[in-house]
Amino acid sequence: MKFKHAKPLALAAAAVAISAAGGAEAAVSPEKQISFLAEQAAVWGTDAFYRDWLQDDGWCAITDLDGNKRLELFFVRAVRNPVPGMNDKGNNEEKGRALVATVPITMRVRGFEVSADGKRLEELKFNYPDKIIPPNLTELREGFYNAGDKTRFYHTYTLNRVRDLGFCLYRQVISLKNGTVEVQTIGTEYGNYGLFMEAATAEAIFDYAEDRHGKKMQEKELSDYVKAYSAGASPADFNMRWIYSEKWKKAQNTPGGVRNAFAENWKEFRWQLKKDTR
Protein backbone atom coordinates (compact mmCIF):
# COMPACT_ATOMS: atom_id res chain seq x y z
CA MET A 1 0.00 0.00 0.00
CA LYS A 2 1.28 3.39 -0.86
CA PHE A 3 1.24 5.76 2.06
CA LYS A 4 3.04 9.02 2.29
CA HIS A 5 4.38 9.51 5.79
CA ALA A 6 4.87 12.99 7.11
CA LYS A 7 8.40 14.25 6.57
CA PRO A 8 10.73 14.18 9.59
CA LEU A 9 10.79 17.52 11.34
CA ALA A 10 13.98 19.56 11.17
CA LEU A 11 14.07 21.53 14.40
CA ALA A 12 16.79 23.97 15.40
CA ALA A 13 17.00 24.13 19.18
CA ALA A 14 19.92 24.60 21.53
CA ALA A 15 20.92 21.73 23.79
CA VAL A 16 21.30 22.53 27.45
CA ALA A 17 23.23 20.80 30.19
CA ILE A 18 20.78 19.17 32.55
CA SER A 19 20.63 16.38 35.04
CA ALA A 20 18.20 13.52 34.50
CA ALA A 21 14.76 14.91 33.74
CA GLY A 22 12.23 14.44 36.47
CA GLY A 23 14.83 14.85 39.20
CA ALA A 24 14.01 11.60 40.95
CA GLU A 25 16.90 9.45 42.10
CA ALA A 26 16.89 5.80 41.15
CA ALA A 27 16.82 3.61 44.24
CA VAL A 28 17.01 0.41 42.23
CA SER A 29 19.31 -0.52 39.34
CA PRO A 30 17.83 -1.03 35.86
CA GLU A 31 18.81 -4.70 36.01
CA LYS A 32 16.84 -5.27 39.20
CA GLN A 33 13.90 -3.31 37.82
CA ILE A 34 13.88 -5.46 34.70
CA SER A 35 13.82 -8.62 36.81
CA PHE A 36 11.01 -7.15 38.87
CA LEU A 37 9.00 -6.25 35.75
CA ALA A 38 9.37 -9.78 34.40
CA GLU A 39 8.15 -11.21 37.71
CA GLN A 40 4.99 -9.08 37.71
CA ALA A 41 3.00 -11.04 35.13
CA ALA A 42 0.19 -11.27 37.67
CA VAL A 43 -0.17 -7.48 37.35
CA TRP A 44 0.23 -6.92 33.61
CA GLY A 45 -0.51 -10.31 32.07
CA THR A 46 -3.78 -11.76 33.37
CA ASP A 47 -6.67 -9.47 32.39
CA ALA A 48 -8.80 -8.91 29.28
CA PHE A 49 -6.50 -6.19 27.93
CA TYR A 50 -3.56 -8.57 27.91
CA ARG A 51 -5.57 -11.40 26.35
CA ASP A 52 -6.73 -9.08 23.56
CA TRP A 53 -3.17 -7.81 23.19
CA LEU A 54 -1.92 -11.38 22.69
CA GLN A 55 -4.69 -12.19 20.22
CA ASP A 56 -4.00 -9.04 18.19
CA ASP A 57 -0.22 -9.65 18.05
CA GLY A 58 0.60 -6.46 19.92
CA TRP A 59 3.93 -4.91 20.87
CA CYS A 60 5.59 -4.10 24.19
CA ALA A 61 8.67 -2.13 25.23
CA ILE A 62 10.80 -1.15 28.21
CA THR A 63 11.45 2.59 28.40
CA ASP A 64 12.32 5.53 30.62
CA LEU A 65 10.41 8.23 28.76
CA ASP A 66 10.40 10.76 31.59
CA GLY A 67 14.04 10.19 32.57
CA ASN A 68 13.31 9.59 36.26
CA LYS A 69 15.24 6.29 36.20
CA ARG A 70 12.11 4.31 37.02
CA LEU A 71 11.49 1.96 34.09
CA GLU A 72 8.19 1.73 32.27
CA LEU A 73 6.56 -1.20 30.49
CA PHE A 74 4.22 -0.27 27.64
CA PHE A 75 1.77 -2.48 25.75
CA VAL A 76 0.29 -1.36 22.41
CA ARG A 77 -2.16 -3.11 20.12
CA ALA A 78 -3.96 -2.15 16.93
CA VAL A 79 -7.71 -2.68 16.56
CA ARG A 80 -8.82 -3.56 13.04
CA ASN A 81 -12.06 -4.57 11.35
CA PRO A 82 -13.03 -5.73 7.84
CA VAL A 83 -13.68 -3.43 4.89
CA PRO A 84 -16.80 -4.29 2.83
CA GLY A 85 -15.87 -6.03 -0.42
CA MET A 86 -12.36 -6.96 0.71
CA ASN A 87 -10.82 -10.14 -0.67
CA ASP A 88 -7.08 -10.72 -0.62
CA LYS A 89 -7.52 -13.33 -3.36
CA GLY A 90 -10.00 -11.39 -5.48
CA ASN A 91 -9.53 -8.78 -8.19
CA ASN A 92 -7.20 -5.83 -7.75
CA GLU A 93 -9.82 -3.56 -6.22
CA GLU A 94 -10.84 -6.24 -3.72
CA LYS A 95 -7.18 -6.79 -2.84
CA GLY A 96 -6.83 -3.05 -2.36
CA ARG A 97 -9.72 -3.13 0.09
CA ALA A 98 -7.97 -5.94 1.96
CA LEU A 99 -4.90 -3.72 2.25
CA VAL A 100 -6.99 -0.88 3.65
CA ALA A 101 -8.38 -3.29 6.25
CA THR A 102 -4.87 -3.62 7.72
CA VAL A 103 -5.02 0.04 8.81
CA PRO A 104 -6.16 0.23 12.46
CA ILE A 105 -9.45 1.89 13.33
CA THR A 106 -7.93 2.76 16.72
CA MET A 107 -5.07 1.86 19.05
CA ARG A 108 -5.16 0.50 22.58
CA VAL A 109 -2.35 1.43 24.96
CA ARG A 110 -1.40 0.57 28.51
CA GLY A 111 1.63 1.32 30.64
CA PHE A 112 3.19 0.55 34.01
CA GLU A 113 6.03 2.16 35.95
CA VAL A 114 8.23 0.73 38.71
CA SER A 115 7.67 2.55 42.00
CA ALA A 116 10.44 4.64 43.57
CA ASP A 117 11.27 1.89 46.07
CA GLY A 118 11.24 -0.78 43.37
CA LYS A 119 8.62 -2.85 45.18
CA ARG A 120 5.43 -2.00 43.28
CA LEU A 121 4.26 -1.75 39.71
CA GLU A 122 2.07 1.32 39.23
CA GLU A 123 -0.29 1.62 36.26
CA LEU A 124 0.12 4.82 34.28
CA LYS A 125 -2.79 7.12 33.54
CA PHE A 126 -3.44 8.53 30.06
CA ASN A 127 -4.80 12.07 29.76
CA TYR A 128 -6.26 13.53 26.55
CA PRO A 129 -6.70 17.33 26.77
CA ASP A 130 -7.65 17.65 23.07
CA LYS A 131 -9.20 14.56 21.48
CA ILE A 132 -9.38 11.05 22.91
CA ILE A 133 -7.13 9.45 20.30
CA PRO A 134 -5.06 6.62 21.81
CA PRO A 135 -1.56 7.12 20.38
CA ASN A 136 0.42 4.70 18.28
CA LEU A 137 3.47 4.64 20.54
CA THR A 138 5.32 2.43 18.06
CA GLU A 139 5.66 5.56 15.91
CA LEU A 140 7.48 7.64 18.53
CA ARG A 141 10.14 9.32 16.42
CA GLU A 142 11.64 12.41 18.01
CA GLY A 143 12.50 13.38 21.55
CA PHE A 144 12.80 16.87 23.03
CA TYR A 145 13.48 18.52 26.38
CA ASN A 146 11.52 21.52 27.63
CA ALA A 147 13.70 23.35 30.14
CA GLY A 148 10.76 25.44 31.34
CA ASP A 149 8.89 22.60 33.02
CA LYS A 150 11.78 20.08 32.91
CA THR A 151 9.79 17.65 30.79
CA ARG A 152 10.78 15.31 28.00
CA PHE A 153 8.29 15.05 25.17
CA TYR A 154 8.00 13.11 21.93
CA HIS A 155 6.31 13.37 18.54
CA THR A 156 4.29 10.50 17.15
CA TYR A 157 1.99 9.82 14.19
CA THR A 158 -1.21 7.85 14.68
CA LEU A 159 -2.91 6.61 11.51
CA ASN A 160 -6.53 5.47 11.91
CA ARG A 161 -8.96 4.27 9.28
CA VAL A 162 -12.27 6.13 9.25
CA ARG A 163 -15.39 4.33 7.99
CA ASP A 164 -14.56 2.16 4.95
CA LEU A 165 -11.92 3.99 2.91
CA GLY A 166 -11.19 7.19 4.81
CA PHE A 167 -8.30 7.90 7.17
CA CYS A 168 -7.03 10.40 9.71
CA LEU A 169 -3.35 10.95 10.45
CA TYR A 170 -3.04 12.47 13.91
CA ARG A 171 0.05 14.48 14.77
CA GLN A 172 0.55 14.00 18.48
CA VAL A 173 2.88 15.03 21.29
CA ILE A 174 3.49 12.59 24.16
CA SER A 175 4.95 13.33 27.58
CA LEU A 176 5.12 11.43 30.85
CA LYS A 177 5.24 13.13 34.23
CA ASN A 178 4.18 12.07 37.72
CA GLY A 179 2.60 8.86 36.49
CA THR A 180 0.46 10.44 33.76
CA VAL A 181 0.97 10.15 30.01
CA GLU A 182 -0.18 13.39 28.41
CA VAL A 183 -1.40 12.87 24.83
CA GLN A 184 -1.89 16.10 22.88
CA THR A 185 -3.30 15.93 19.35
CA ILE A 186 -1.94 19.12 17.80
CA GLY A 187 -2.96 18.48 14.20
CA THR A 188 -4.87 16.12 11.93
CA GLU A 189 -4.60 15.24 8.24
CA TYR A 190 -7.66 13.84 6.47
CA GLY A 191 -7.97 11.80 3.32
CA ASN A 192 -9.21 8.69 1.55
CA TYR A 193 -7.71 5.58 0.01
CA GLY A 194 -7.96 5.31 -3.76
CA LEU A 195 -8.50 1.87 -5.31
CA PHE A 196 -7.57 0.78 -8.83
CA MET A 197 -8.52 -2.15 -11.06
CA GLU A 198 -5.13 -1.81 -12.77
CA ALA A 199 -3.10 -2.60 -9.65
CA ALA A 200 -3.59 -4.30 -6.29
CA THR A 201 -2.86 -1.25 -4.19
CA ALA A 202 -4.50 1.43 -2.09
CA GLU A 203 -3.12 4.92 -2.44
CA ALA A 204 -3.48 7.48 0.32
CA ILE A 205 -4.97 10.66 -1.14
CA PHE A 206 -4.74 13.60 1.24
CA ASP A 207 -7.64 16.05 1.34
CA TYR A 208 -6.93 18.72 3.95
CA ALA A 209 -5.42 19.29 7.38
CA GLU A 210 -6.42 21.20 10.48
CA ASP A 211 -4.70 22.31 13.67
CA ARG A 212 -5.82 21.50 17.21
CA HIS A 213 -8.28 24.40 17.13
CA GLY A 214 -9.99 23.22 13.93
CA LYS A 215 -8.37 25.75 11.61
CA LYS A 216 -8.10 24.25 8.12
CA MET A 217 -4.76 24.37 6.36
CA GLN A 218 -2.60 22.65 3.77
CA GLU A 219 -0.22 19.81 4.59
CA LYS A 220 2.87 22.04 4.56
CA GLU A 221 1.16 24.57 6.83
CA LEU A 222 0.45 21.81 9.33
CA SER A 223 4.06 20.61 9.17
CA ASP A 224 5.20 24.16 9.93
CA TYR A 225 2.67 24.36 12.75
CA VAL A 226 3.97 21.13 14.32
CA LYS A 227 7.55 22.31 13.87
CA ALA A 228 6.77 25.57 15.66
CA TYR A 229 5.39 23.62 18.61
CA SER A 230 8.88 22.33 19.42
CA ALA A 231 10.88 25.35 18.29
CA GLY A 232 11.87 26.38 21.81
CA ALA A 233 12.81 22.90 23.01
CA SER A 234 16.13 21.07 22.91
CA PRO A 235 16.28 18.06 20.54
CA ALA A 236 17.45 14.70 21.82
CA ASP A 237 19.12 11.68 20.30
CA PHE A 238 16.26 9.27 20.92
CA ASN A 239 15.82 5.61 20.06
CA MET A 240 13.63 2.76 21.21
CA ARG A 241 12.57 -0.62 19.90
CA TRP A 242 9.54 -2.83 20.37
CA ILE A 243 9.20 -6.51 21.20
CA TYR A 244 7.07 -8.06 18.48
CA SER A 245 4.57 -10.88 18.86
CA GLU A 246 6.75 -13.65 17.48
CA LYS A 247 9.63 -12.84 19.83
CA TRP A 248 7.27 -12.44 22.76
CA LYS A 249 5.65 -15.83 22.28
CA LYS A 250 9.07 -17.44 22.02
CA ALA A 251 10.19 -15.69 25.21
CA GLN A 252 7.15 -16.96 27.08
CA ASN A 253 8.03 -20.54 26.23
CA THR A 254 11.66 -20.20 27.32
CA PRO A 255 12.85 -20.27 30.96
CA GLY A 256 13.92 -16.72 31.80
CA GLY A 257 12.82 -15.67 28.33
CA VAL A 258 10.63 -12.73 29.35
CA ARG A 259 13.36 -11.20 31.50
CA ASN A 260 15.91 -11.67 28.71
CA ALA A 261 13.55 -10.10 26.18
CA PHE A 262 13.03 -7.12 28.49
CA ALA A 263 16.78 -6.77 29.08
CA GLU A 264 17.59 -6.87 25.36
CA ASN A 265 14.86 -4.36 24.63
CA TRP A 266 16.09 -1.96 27.31
CA LYS A 267 19.56 -1.95 25.74
CA GLU A 268 17.99 -0.39 22.63
CA PHE A 269 16.56 2.56 24.54
CA ARG A 270 18.54 5.77 24.17
CA TRP A 271 17.85 9.38 25.15
CA GLN A 272 20.55 12.02 25.17
CA LEU A 273 20.47 15.71 24.39
CA LYS A 274 22.09 16.57 21.10
CA LYS A 275 25.14 18.79 21.23
CA ASP A 276 24.78 22.41 20.24
CA THR A 277 26.30 22.61 16.75
CA ARG A 278 25.83 26.33 16.24
Listing of model-derived features with the role each one plays in the protein:
Residues 2-10:
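Bacterial N-terminal signal peptides that target proteins for export
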Residues 27-31, 84-126, 172-177:
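Beta-propeller blade repeat segments, especially FG-GAP/WD-type strand-to-loop junctions
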Residues 26, 32, 137-278:
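Acidic, small-residue rich beta-repeat scaffolds with periodic aromatic anchors
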Residues 58, 105-109, 167-169, 181:
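Repetitive beta-architecture junctions, highlighting loop-to-beta-strand starts
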Residues 46-58, 128-144:
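Repeat-based blade/solenoid architectures
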Residues 65-78, 146-158:
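Acidic/hydrophobic-patterned starts of short beta strands in beta-sheet-rich repeat architectures
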Residues 27-61, 69:
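N-terminal "mature head" segments of proteins
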